[in-house]
Amino acid sequence: MDCVTNATTRCRKGSIVVIVMPPLISNNTFFLMNTTNDGNGGSVSYDYPLLSNQNSLITNTTNNLTSDSTNTDISNETPILSNNTPILMNTPTNPNSDSDTTTPTVVSHTVELITEEKKVISKIVYSDGTEDVKELDLTDFYNSAYNEGYSAGVNSVDFSKTGYIIENGIIKVTTTLTNGKSQEYNITLDENLVVSLYNQIMANKSSCFQIRQNETEYSFLVESRQYQPQPNLAYQPAVDGTPVYEVLGQEQKTWSFTLYVDSIPKMQFLQQLASNPLIEVYFDEIGDWKQALIQSISLSRITTGHYYADIELIILE
């Protein structure tokens, strides 16, 4: 018996042809082949298996899927996404970077009392060159401040309809009340009082509030303030130096402020004051540095790095 081996094995024994087929799946990867047939029952040839260990289509390299039948590898010198490609970068970006601005600080704050025009002008100059000018008409102010709590026309005064003069810091008003009697009013008007009253009405960024503790000192813009007339007990550090505060026995007033906090260091400074409340403060109404004790302090976030701080304190000296 003579045999011819090719893609199939055909053995001739007399007139009987025995065809021996290889297994469908073998180590030689005959299952999927790029086969051709001669059409005459001749031998079957094969060139490249579609899936084999030699197939470069599925490899660790990047192949050119649109190349010729040789599956030539494309160069991987410039991979589509690499560490040098900015498409995928582990670098945070600020989507609002073009519009980011630094909050300006207050350079100067001046208050001018114009007696002839019966008004006060407050001007704040910021570090970016902008100015914030506010004007308070004293007539309108005293109509509101003096007559608060009184019904219109009942023992009340309409300063816009009465003549008054300002002499040596005193407003002198002579008017006729609804009962027909004349009455003279003297209202002391010094610059500190005007600043104080002005800031209570036009509080938005109207003045600076300064706090210092040890060697640290910060300034804040005042968003609002309220001077509460009810008495509160003042405190002083205990004699033995502990952080306990003893009652002095004298009555003091509580000052309430809402401050604008424009940086994280300022916010952190205020946070630690909750456990270390003895400070020195300076603001318009007191006119000098005073020792104070914080009664309460709370922070509310506006946006990143910007906060409002509500603070209550009493002056100790």
Swiss-Prot record:
Q: Which species is this record about?
A: Methanocaldococcus jannaschii (strain ATCC 43067 / DSM 2661 / JAL-1 / JCM 10045 / NBRC 100440)
- Which taxonomic lineage is given here? Archaea, Methanobacteriati, Methanobacteriota, Methanomada group, Methanococci
Region feature (Disordered): 68-87
Q: Could you tell me where the Low complexity compositional bias lies?
A: 68-78
Look up the domain of life of the source: Archaea
Full protein name = Uncharacterized protein MJ0345
